[in-house]
Each structure stands twice: as C-alpha cells, then as structure tokens.
Swiss-Prot record:
It catalyses: (2R,3S)-3-isopropylmalate + NAD(+) = 4-methyl-2-oxopentanoate + CO2 + NADH. Homodimer. This is 3-isopropylmalate dehydrogenase. It holds the Pfam family Iso_dh. Pathway: Amino-acid biosynthesis; L-leucine biosynthesis; L-leucine from 3-methyl-2-oxobutanoate: step 3/4.
Length: 363
C-alpha cells in the first residue's frame, strides 16, 4: 500500500508566497509522474502571521507542523516589522523557535555552479569553468553561539566580553554521520573543517570525526583548518564534495559557498533532526523590494522541495527528476532576471511552469 505523506507549507513574507506557488506546481508534477500520495496544509508564519494572529509563530502553525512529515518554509521578514522588539520580529520569532522546537541540529546547504551560469560566478573564468558541487553540513545547536558562560563584565579599560566554544562528543558524532551518509550518495569525499592546531574543541572534533570515519571505509576523509578552507574555496572549489563544519565555521563557509555560485536564488537549505524530520527553505531572504513583481527566482524554493523529497521522504527518484528538469530549463536558456544579464528574462510563474512541465515529461 502506498504511504501517504503530509507536508506543512509555510509561505511567509515577501517573495515567499510567489516562489512557494512554483514549488507547489512542481510538487503537483511529481505527484502526477510518480503516483506519490503527498498532501499539504498551508499555515501562516512570520510577518503575515503577526498581521493575522499577533504572533510570528502561532500555536496553530506549530501544531500543524507537528502533524506533518516535513516543513516546506518560504521566507520571513521585511521593513514593515522592523519596529518590533527583536524577539518578536519575524526572523527571530519564527525560524529560531521552530528549529528549537523540533530539535533541528544539522543544516545542509548545497552550493552548485550550474552549467551555463559560469559568467555569474565571481571567481576567475578558468576556475569557474571547472564547476563545483558542494554540500556544506553544519552543526546547528552547539559551539560558540550557545556555549556558556558568555557575557560582558567590568568597566572602562577593564571591561571585557567573552563567549565559550563547547562541543560534546555526541554532538560531533551525530553531525559527522550526517556528513558521511550524505557523501555516500554523492562523490564519497568528506572534508572536515576545524582549528585543531589551536582549539581544544577542534582537537576533540577531529578525534571524533576520525572515529566515525572508521565506520565508512568507502568515504575518503581529509581535515582542513578553517583559514585554509576559506582560501581553498576561492582557489579551487571543485576539490570539495562534502564539507563537515561546526556551527561557527559552517556559518562562515556556507555563506562563502553561496556567494561563489553567483545567485542566492539558486540555493536551498535543509535543517534536520535525529528522526529525519526537516525544515526546508531557500537560503536567501524575503526580498520585499521585488515581492509581487513576478521577477523572483523560484529555483531555490523548488530545490528546497527536492531536498525534502530526498531527506525526509526518501523519494530520490522524484528529487532526481526535479533536478534534471531544472538542468534542462537552464540548458535551454530559460532565465529569471537575476540570471539573465542583458538577455531575455522570464517571470517567476513562467519558470515554475517550465520546470513542472519538464518533470512531467521526464527529461
């Protein structure tokens, strides 16, 4: 009997509803082609939820997500809500509580330079010509952002501020397994990023990662210091497959990976817990300046759906079909404004239609 899956859809603010509508088209195409039983429910989140319910994350939204197999998230925030106290603003009041509530400890950020988009890569042309396809696996719940003690004390010239980098063995083990399992489905290479020549937390990180690697003899492991990694990403990103990073180092490298692709409109993101439940979202923001103009690139949102199908639902064939459809659209010259340069640009809705069509046709 075919299992029925349920997705909680949270469009959010800005371009969120527009690009989410395109992901919904592609989901319909996947259902049609593969006979999948996937239902969806739409819930308010972010600024839209503040306007309707007085809270960026209403209880009904959380309850709906609890009943789902995964969350497909749009984007939140905008100048309309910047006057609110920081904790009540859409970004901090919605996304962070969702991550905490569902214990999402791992963040996966693919960064790929698609064929035909080399001119948008800021790297030297000979480097861009080699292409790259990187998955940045970042630990989300430990490290210096959450370690205690932290604070400020003293006055005048003796005032000081401090943060604490703390990692437990279990935190490193579980994120390392995510990286190695992901590498098995890719090119079987993991590069673990640390600062083991200086930091005790990085020494433990390296020891634990080496131990986990013994369970994956088919995956090649290398270690790289964070300062060298930032340089190597610019020098030759094609050398990397899966980057395994702590919270701080992953924050830095995932944004660097994003920048060298040439467009934030192409970058999805997945945040997972130990049960495989995930929140999937574009890596970019809500872009309120272009909302409602039919010019936003929906591919990041569509690729977020691809990650959802792959990691939470285990539907690799459907995920592969969407990725092939996106490749086909780009290879045939279809571009939204962020990728068109001086050439012809199509709209948000048109790009969604084309990708959905290619999914159904099975290109």
């Amino acid at each position: 009997m075919t299992k029925t899956y349920h997705i909680a859809v949270l469009p959010g603010d800005g371009i969120g509803p527009e690009v989410m509508a395109q992901a919904s088209k592609v989901l319909d195409a996947v259902r049609q082609r593969f006979g999948l039983k996937i239902s969806t429910s739409v819930y308010d989140v972010g600024g839209a939820a503040i306007d309707r319910h007085g809270s960026p994350l209403p209880a009904a939204t959380v309850a709906g997500c609890e009943q789902a197999d995964a969350i497909l998230f749009g984007s939140v925030g905008g100048p309309k809500w910047e006057h609110l106290p920081p904790a009540e603003q859409p970004e901090r009041g919605a996304l962070l509580p969702l991550r905490k509530h569902f214990k999402l400890f791992s963040n996966l950020r693919p960064a790929r330079l698609y064929q035909g988009l080399e001119d948008f890569c800021p790297l030297r042309s000979d480097i861009a010509a080699r292409g790259f396809d990187i998955l940045c696996v970042r630990e989300l719940t430990g490290g210096i952002y959450f370690g205690q003690p932290k604070g400020r004390e003293g006055q005048g010239m003796h005032e000081r501020a401090f943060d604490t980098e703390v990692y437990h063995r279990f935190e490193i083990e579980r994120i390392a397994r995510i990286a190695f399992e992901s590498a098995r489905k890719r090119r079987s290479k993991v590069t673990s990023i640390d600062k083991a020549n200086v930091l005790q937390s990085s020494i433990l990180w390296r020891e634990v990662v080496n131990g986990i690697a013994a369970d994956y003899p088919d995956v090649a492991l290398s270690h790289m210091y964070i300062d060298n990694a930032t340089m190597q990403l610019i020098k030759d990103p094609s050398q990397f497959d899966v980057l395994l990073c702590s919270n701080l180092f992953g924050d830095i490298l995932s944004d660097e990976c994003a920048m060298i692709t040439g467009s934030m409109g192409m970058l999805p993101s997945a945040s997972l817990n130990e049960q495989g439940f995930g929140l999937y979202e574009p890596a970019g923001g809500s872009a309120p300046d272009i909302a409602g103009k039919n010019i936003a690139n929906p591919i990041a949102q569509i690729l977020s759906l691809t990650l959802l199908l792959r990691f939470s639902l285990g539907k690799d064939d459907a995920a592969d079909a969407i990725e092939r459809a996106i490749n086909q659209a780009l290879e045939q010259g279809y571009r939204t404004a962020d990728l068109a340069g001086d050439g012809h640009a199509i709209g948000t809705h048109e790009m969604g239609d084309i990708i959905a069509k290619f999914v159904v046709e099975g290109v």
